[in-house]
């Protein structure tokens, strides 16, 4: 279950003893916080029971070629998370990026040991387009085989889901789960 950071402790208590993991989002949904804020928010969420971290990348920094900012946030968040046995999903917002920027985001994710690259926050009303099969295929081609790819954003049907899996997605994020499963 993925929740906002302020609910990490409550979710961890409610789910204690179950197989359901607590995931929390960091710098959601825009990713514009400074690296030190993201690192602190991550450490706090982990201390309160989060087992997975969904970090929204600073897209503005990436697009402005301020890779030092992205490096700093990734280094700190991955170190804090892996130190507690948690995985990190980096949300890169592919609908806002060029192909070259997607490639660069994947390079930075690999450099810092991100576990899963995620296409989007899914806030598609704010984005110029939804996640595409081509986005997933490009990410899959640019990350190591053991790095996961999570497709999210605009996935509403069984056909959408199967196309994303065929393109290389190892996880799907969708709010239409019941409809997707019903179509199988």
Identify the function of each model-found stretch:
Residues 6-149, 157-184:
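Alpha/beta enzyme core
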């Amino acid at each position: 279950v993925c929740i906002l950071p302020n609910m990490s402790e409550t979710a961890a208590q409610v789910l204690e003893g179950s197989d359901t993991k607590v995931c929390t989002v960091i710098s959601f949904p825009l990713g514009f916080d400074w690296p030190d804020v993201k690192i602190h928010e991550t450490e706090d969420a982990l201390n309160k029971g989060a087992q997975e971290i969904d970090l929204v990348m600073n897209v503005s920094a990436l697009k402005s070629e301020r890779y030092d900012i992205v490096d700093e946030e990734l280094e700190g968040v991955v170190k804090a998370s892996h130190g507690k046995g948690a995985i990190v999903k980096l949300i890169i917002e592919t609908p806002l990026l060029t192909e070259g920027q997607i490639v660069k985001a994947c390079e930075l994710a690999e450099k810092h040991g991100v576990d899963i690259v995620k296409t989007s926050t899914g806030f598609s009303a704010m984005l110029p387009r939804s996640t595409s099969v081509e986005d997933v295929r490009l990410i899959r081609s640019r990350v190591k085989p053991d790095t996961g790819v999570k497709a999210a954003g605009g996935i509403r049907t069984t056909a959408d889901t199967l196309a994303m899996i065929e393109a290389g997605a190892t996880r799907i994020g969708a709010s239409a789960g019941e409809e997707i499963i019903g179509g199988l």
